[in-house]
């Protein structure tokens, strides 16, 4: 762990948001003009957190910081074995439970079917599949490569998770303006479903940061968990009622984790500088 580096969270998040939002809103405007998605703008938008992290590392950090970053990507020995089952199975099991609860309350049982296609971008199956895998990896190289640690150098883990959860949610804003995107479809169904998207990120941030710091800041583990977040949401024909229940269950689990690990979440700082 890098203990003698002064993190610059404000600079980092301004860079990450600027890169993502500039390119993201360009795509949003083009999508309403009938222009095909420009893969360069799309990649730059999703790579905002990672590009910002690279800028911070090469402008403000030394070789030891960069070596630590590389180690946290590739070194699987950072991962504690007892966290692997939770990482792999928690999200899909929670989604199935959410669907079952919704069925009890009258929602269609067809939700338990495997989805015929992924719905990140309607009608663009291959692009959606790539995004489901590639984007979580690119995000986590930035968020856990620099962003979350920069917040954890200033705040305890609970405040870090709450602040990051809000920032992470707002970071997705351009997607809500892209025609045929999953996020834009939420508004069309009901504003509550769009609100649920943002609310659900908060407990997710708590759970992910807990895993991250319990596993010696392994970027690999959190990237895998993030990929499973996306796949669990798209694997079944789950409707938005089930996804609201999913958010509720995530919140319950996040609260339990915080209560059972109070000293871990409320110690002064996760990273001393």
List where the protein language model places each region.
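Membrane-interface helix/loop boundary segments of multi-pass membrane proteins
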Residues: 138-170, 213-218
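Membrane-interface interhelical connector segments
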Residues: 142-149, 178-189
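Alpha-helical transmembrane segments and their helix-entry boundary regions
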Residues: 9-13, 83-84, 146, 160-161, ...
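Hydrophobic/aromatic residues in alpha-helical transmembrane segments
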Residues: 97, 147, 204-208
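Transmembrane alpha-helix/helix-exit interface in multi-pass inner-membrane proteins
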Residues: 95-103, 140, 159-181
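Functionally important transmembrane alpha-helices
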Residues: 186-251
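Specific transmembrane helices
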Residues: 2-136, 164, 196, 234-273
């Amino acid at each position: 762990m890098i203990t003698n580096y002064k993190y610059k969270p404000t600079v980092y998040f301004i860079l990450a948001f600027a890169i993502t939002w500039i390119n993201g809103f360009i795509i949003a405007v083009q999508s309403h003009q009938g222009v095909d998605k420009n893969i360069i703008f799309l990649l730059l938008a999703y790579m905002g957190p990672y590009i910002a992290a690279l800028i911070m590392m090469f402008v403000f950090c030394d070789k030891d910081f960069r070596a630590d970053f590389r180690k946290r990507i590739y070194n699987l020995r950072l991962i504690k074995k007892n966290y692997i089952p939770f990482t792999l199975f928690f999200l899909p099991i929670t989604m199935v439970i959410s669907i079952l609860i919704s069925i009890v309350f009258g929602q269609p049982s067809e939700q338990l079917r495997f989805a015929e296609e992924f719905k990140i971008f309607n009608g663009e199956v291959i692009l959606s599949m790539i995004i489901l895998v590639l984007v979580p990896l690119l995000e986590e190289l930035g968020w856990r490569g620099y962003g979350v640690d920069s917040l954890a150098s200033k705040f305890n883990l609970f405040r870090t998770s709450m602040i990051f959860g809000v920032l992470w949610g707002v970071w997705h804003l351009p997607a809500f303006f892209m025609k045929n995107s999953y996020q834009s479809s939420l508004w069309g169904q009901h504003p509550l479903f769009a609100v649920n998207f943002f609310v659900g990120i908060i407990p997710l941030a708590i759970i992910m940061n807990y895993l991250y710091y319990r596993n010696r800041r392994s970027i690999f583990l959190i990237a895998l968990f993030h990929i499973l977040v996306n796949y669990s949401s798209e694997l079944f024909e789950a409707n938005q009622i089930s996804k609201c229940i999913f958010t509720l269950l995530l919140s319950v689990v996040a609260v339990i984790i915080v209560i059972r690990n109070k000293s871990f979440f409320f110690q002064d700082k996760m990273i001393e500088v």
